[in-house]
From Swiss-Prot:
PANTHER family per record: 50S RIBOSOMAL PROTEIN L15 (PTHR12934), LARGE RIBOSOMAL SUBUNIT PROTEIN UL15M (PTHR12934:SF11)
Any Pfam family: Ribosomal_L27A
PROSITE patterns: RIBOSOMAL_L15
Protein name in the entry: Large ribosomal subunit protein uL15
A GO cellular-component term linked to this record: cytosolic large ribosomal subunit
Keyword set includes Metal-binding: no
Gene3D superfamilies: 3.100.10.10
Organism this protein belongs to: Parasynechococcus marenigrum (strain WH8102)
Amino acid sequence: MTTLRLESLKANKGARRRKLRKGRGIAAGQGASCGFGMRGQKSRSGRPTRPGFEGGQMPLYRRVPKLKHFPLVNPKHFTVLNVSALNSLKDGSTVNLDSLVKDGVVTSPKHPLKILGNGDLTAKKLTVQAAAFTASARTKIEAAGGSCETLD
């Protein structure tokens, strides 16, 4: 058995095919029209039509309206809770995500807590600890005598 050397390498039988020479007579199999059909734009010499060209008709990529908005790459997700949901809690208690899960107000604490301002808060002095507050939620909690603490 001969050793494998660079000069002794040889391709397998049938692995290398001869280049197809088009337009060199009908006996070659690719003569006359060279496999491009009879007539038309695609049978002519030169570059074929560009991608997306539809023969002069307004192409699809120009018929479709432009997108006006692209979504955020890394959006912030929050577990949202309205001010009206805080009415069920005890007066003077500290409200955070853990206490809300324990009280059964929040069922799936996947994301940080954000307090929204929908609804009314009865006069309760609550210390609310959340990642974010809306402006209306902050004013309603502080008007009821409570305080807002923003967590990082």
